[in-house]
Amino acid sequence: MSSFDQTMQFHFSEEPAETNVREVLLTVYGALQEKGYNPINQIVGYLLSGDPAYIPRHKDARALIRKIERDELIEELVKFYLQGQRKD
């Protein structure tokens, strides 16, 4: 069986992030709104491409978001979304 037929596992470190992902995303979201951009489109563009040009320098948003790896941002977004969808 080739390695393409097997499910790969992706592991994150369980150490707390130095930078609060939620605070960074909210700051970036606010900066994008203030500049007149669609924040969701811009953040998705950044997450998919890795191109920091999607994020403005306003309120130091570009520098803030670049301190966090994109996979960490995606992980936090998925966790937040799925936790909100659980019906326990």
Swiss-Prot record:
Pfam families: IreB. It comes from the Bacteria. InterPro entries: IreB (IPR009309). PANTHER family: UPF0297 PROTEIN YRZL. NCBIfam families: PRK05473.1. Belongs to the UPF0297 family. This is UPF0297 protein GK2555. It comes from Geobacillus kaustophilus (strain HTA426).
